[in-house]
Amino acid sequence: MDKTREQLLQRYEELQQAKAKVEKDLLKIPGVAAVSVGLKETNDSYTDEMCLRVYVEKKKPAKEIPEGELIPRRINNFLIDVNEIPKDVTGSAAFKPDYGKYRPLTGGIAIKSARSKQFGTLGCMVLDVAEGEVFLLTNFHVLLTNGEEKGHDVGQPDFCCEPCPCRCGEIARIERWGDWDTDNVDCAIALLTSDQQNNWNNDVLELGPIRSIRLDDTGTPVHRVRPNDTVFKRGFSSGRTEGIVIDPTAPITVGFHTKNGDVFKSFTDQILSKIKYRKSLF
């Protein structure tokens, strides 16, 4: 019988308390990289059973692991699910990318920096309340892995409509970004050009308007994503996808294409989901 969201949330809180008690000991086991709470996976399929998720670089058969280094199947009646740290290379989607030109600007469309041959996805627009200026929000790896600097141009989808040498696709200039070496975020913003400051909307293509996040008195979101929640995404290469959250605080290793080859970076506290539906772009 499928569990209700209330039942899953109750179990989630119980497991969070259990994790706080056992995480330190689990991390002492050789090969264990992280511990979190999420859904149990079986044969690459998710279930609605909540568990402690233990992440390792590489899973091994039990017979190859010294007895003192085996990860227990349960701790205090809480199920443990051992998983390899997810790895992904951006731009590896097997879908036909959407290189369409969109005006007004909106989330979920293709953009690229002047120095890059790779395209990425525009996430949404953000407002600098103090200055009244509008920026586009995207990933560091989309705009800054080819030697780009502040002030370098961003195009949508590209800069010129070949074969003419115009710059009609220029929409923004790189402004600032998360510290690639120390931050646990993959983000960057670019200031919209003067002709685009009022040529945008607060939507994500195929998903609709972005709604505000309500915070409590401590600044914590009132509604936070939890295991088994349904989430949606629209990427320029993946199209519109619908997925189920497996783990809202997972470690993930991501590979990015650069002019010097693929570069891999590890992140923690990331939302890990499984796609259950993908809408074709064409």
Per-range role (PLM):
Residues 1-126, 134:
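Noncatalytic regulatory segments and standalone regulatory/sensor domains
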Residues 76, 262-265, 280:
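Short non-domain terminal segments
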Residues 95-275:
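Serine endopeptidase catalytic core focused on the charge-relay Asp
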Residues 276-282:
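Extracellular low-complexity, Gly/Ser/Thr-rich intrinsically disordered linkers
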